[in-house]
UniProtKB/Swiss-Prot annotation:
Gene encoding the protein: H-RAS
Binding site for GTP: 10-17, 57-61, 116-119
Source organism of the structure: Moloney murine sarcoma virus
CDD domains hit by this protein: H_N_K_Ras_like
The protein's name in its UniProt record: GTPase HRas
PROSITE patterns, per database record: RAS (PS51421)
Lipid-anchored residues (S-farnesyl cysteine): 186
Membrane topology: Lipid-anchor
EC number: 3.6.5.2
Length: 189
C-alpha cells in the first residue's frame, strides 16, 4: 500500500485542523484551539488504489515557524490553505510556497491551493483572485468548507493525484533527444 505524506500549511485560524479532522473523523470542530503539530493517518481508496494518507497538521502561528523547515523536508505534498474571509492569510500563501520550494530545493513540488470557509457569506478574497494565483503557480485550486464538508475530500485527493503525477514526471523525464537540433550531430565545414 502506498503511503503519502501530506502537510497542511497556512496562517493561523484558516481551518487547517478543521479540514483535517473533517476528512479523518467526519466531524466539524467548532472551537479554535491553536495547533502546535498533529499527525493523522487514514486509509482511503483514490482512483481504485488503496493508500495511506499520513497528514501533518501544522502550526500557523509565527512563533512556531522554526519547526516548518523540518516538516517541509519530509512532506511529499502540501495543502496551502487560506480563509476566503481573511485577505492576509491569502497574501501569506506566497511565503509558504517560497519556503516549501527553498526547503525542498525545487520549483516542482506538489501543492494544492485551498480556499477554506466558503460557506461564509462574508468574503474578502474573490474566487477569481485565488484561481489566478493557482494558475500562476501551476497548481490546482479547490474551494472548501470544513463546516459543510464541501471540497474536503477533493482537496486531499487532488493533492495525492498531484504527488502521483510528480513521481511519474521524475521517473519519465521529458525526452531530450526528440526532433530538432539536439537529436542530430551536425558537422559544419
Amino acid at each position: 500500500m502506498t503511503e503519502y505524506k501530506l502537510v497542511v500549511v497556512g496562517a493561523k485560524g484558516v481551518g487547517k485542523s478543521a479540514l483535517t479532522i473533517q476528512l479523518i473523523q467526519n466531524h466539524f470542530v467548532d472551537e479554535y484551539d491553536p495547533t502546535i503539530e498533529d499527525s493523522y493517518r487514514k486509509q482511503v481508496v483514490i482512483d481504485g488504489e488503496t493508500c495511506l494518507l499520513d497528514i501533518l497538521d501544522t502550526a500557523g502561528q509565527e512563533e512556531y515557524s522554526a519547526m516548518r523547515d523540518q516538516y517541509m523536508r519530509t512532506g511529499e505534498g502540501f495543502l496551502c490553505v487560506f480563509a476566503i474571509n481573511n485577505t492576509k492569510s491569502f497574501e501569506d500563501i506566497h511565503q509558504y510556497r517560497e519556503q516549501i520550494k527553498r526547503v525542498k530545493d525545487s520549483d516542482d513540488v506538489p501543492m494544492v491551493l485551498v480556499g477554506n470557509k466558503c460557506d461564509l457569506a462574508a468574503r474578502t478574497v474573490e474566487s477569481r483572485q485565488a484561481q489566478d494565483l493557482a494558475r500562476s503557480y501551476g497548481i490546482p485550486y479547490i474551494k472548501t468548507s470544513a463546516k459543510t464538508r464541501q471540497g474536503v475530500e477533493d482537496a486531499f485527493y487532488t493533492l495525492v493525484r498531484e504527488i502521483r503525477q510528480h513521481k511519474l514526471r521524475k521517473l519519465n523525464p521529458p525526452d531530450e533527444s526528440g526532433p530538432g537540433c539536439m537529436s542530430c550531430k551536425c558537422v559544419l565545414s
